[in-house]
């Protein structure tokens, strides 16, 4: 509060983290939450669309669906499980009319192809910690997506990412901490805080 923050969104990445988020949002008026399963957890934490919808409706401070998406960089979850989980999150997001918080790493084509199937649903897309290519950003802009920049954009080897964000419309750019990770230069390597 001392630095001017009015609201904070904490993101669910697993069933366990969602249980913690429910407790946190009840005791702190400025913290809101999301419900979702990170792609790395999608083979372990199997959920259905109704679970997401019911839990979101039962908690007025749950305001988003995710973090969800595809991450083919690591092999923490099977691709088919990630795709199935991502699709369920998208359907819940559309049903609730909540923003969809999307993680995409080494899966630009697959992520876009799936999101594009829902274009007519006017899905609200937030590309979390976006590090994708300019071409990927251009396609996502056609889906009216928002893009969040993390501390990565300040790293000296992020010139291509910096150029991509110059290309994105300013009213579609958000800033995120991805706390406690990805502190910006010159705090790199330290705990990242809002």
Model-identified regions with their sequence ranges:
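Mid-domain alpha/beta scaffold segments of enzyme catalytic cores
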Residues: 1-194
């Amino acid at each position: 509060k001392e630095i001017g923050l009015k609201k904070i969104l904490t993101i669910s990445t697993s069933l366990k983290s969602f249980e913690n988020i429910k407790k946190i949002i009840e005791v702190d008026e400025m913290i809101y939450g999301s419900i979702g399963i990170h792609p790395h957890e999608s083979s372990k934490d199997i959920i259905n669309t109704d679970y997401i919808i019911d839990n979101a409706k039962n908690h007025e401070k749950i305001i988003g669906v995710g973090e969800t998406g595809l991450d083919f960089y690591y092999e923490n979850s099977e691709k088919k499980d990630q795709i199935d989980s991502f699709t369920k999150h998208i359907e819940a997001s559309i049903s609730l009319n909540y923003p969809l918080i999307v993680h995409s790493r080494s899966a630009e084509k697959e992520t876009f192809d799936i999101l594009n199937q829902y274009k007519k649903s006017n899905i609200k897309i937030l590309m979390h910690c976006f590090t994708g290519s300019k071409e990927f950003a251009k396609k996502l802009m056609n889906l009216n997506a928002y893009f969040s920049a993390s501390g990565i954009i300040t790293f000296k080897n992020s010139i291509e990412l910096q150029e991509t964000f110059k290309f994105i419309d300013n009213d579609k750019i958000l800033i995120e901490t991805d706390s406690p990770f990805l502190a910006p230069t010159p705090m790199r390597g330290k705990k990242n805080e809002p």
